[in-house]
Amino acid sequence: MVSKGFVFVLLFISFLSLLKFNYCRATNWASPGNYVHACYTDIAALYSERELDTNAFPYQSATNSFEYPPIIGLGNWLISFLNLGNNSINLFFDINAFLIIIFFIISAFLVMKINPRYSYLYPLAPAVGASLFINWDLWVVFSMILTIYYFDKKKFEISGILLGVAIATKFFPVVFLLPIAIIFYRNRQVFEFIRYTLNTLLIYLAFNLPIAIFYFDGWWRFFKLNLERGAEFGSIWYGLSLLAINLSYFNSFSTIFTLLAIAYLIIYLIKLPSTPSLAQVAFLSVVAITTFARVY
């Protein structure tokens, strides 16, 4: 039985987040107000900056392509063809906000199904309400949670396909392959892991390969930007830089500490007395990668 209180929380958080972004919506997303009021969003910014307002294909430019993987890029390209009228930027945001709320609500119910004890932790997390519409992260969160749900149901083929969708949406879900590999290894299901990985790879390539072939520079721009980015808001390294700590070699530190975190996670998962579920350890793989990353 679905709790009315839970539904109320989901709708209330969605409303609060919309309220937070409403100042920018009312002022046409102008700067510096979007930063002062903490309502900046890539959704509005990239609509015109990446020429979606003219229905331009998001990966046709080598220098101004859409800096997100294909599912987000193609999805927003399709949205741009809707008859948005004179107030197109706000309607573009509204359509995206509606989709994000749908993904948020469904993913919250999936978390409840995976483990009811933690159902409220996800929607009530301050970072969720504060940044619900800052970009399209809920698209990938939705597919990641579905990946976990079906994996722990032993429906590996569906889970592998969904992981391919998740990686083609934001790429960082590739870190799930680490705990998945260890779970299969512990269960002596090596061939099942190979099949799982092939399903994931085929779906990823289905979305990426055509664009990479015909618009390689535009497709590669997402990876190029992430490889070249410095320490940004939310990362440990940016916080340390505010303390006037010399971080000339922070890229090397980031790589070394990330590899150490991954190595420790592998040892930890292998030495566990019993095989964990993906729901129990997926978070650890994300933490191992994001804690020392240049961008959080």
Where are the language model's segments positioned?
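Aromatic/glycine/proline-enriched transmembrane-helix motif characteristic
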Residues: 105, 230-295
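Perimembrane helix-loop-helix junctions
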Residues: 1, 175-202
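Specific aromatic-rich, kink-prone transmembrane helix
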Residues: 140-156
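Membrane-interface alpha helices of multi-pass inner-membrane proteins
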Residues: 127-130, 146-147, 157-181, 283-291
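Transmembrane-helix signature of polytopic, membrane-embedded enzymes
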Residues: 109-126, 154, 158, 275-278
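TM-lumen/periplasm interface segments of multi-pass membrane proteins
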Residues: 1-115, 227
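Short acidic/glycine- and proline-prone juxtamembrane loop motifs at membrane-interface regions
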Residues: 132-140
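Extracytoplasmic catalytic-loop and juxtamembrane helix elements of membrane-embedded
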Residues: 29-38, 211-241
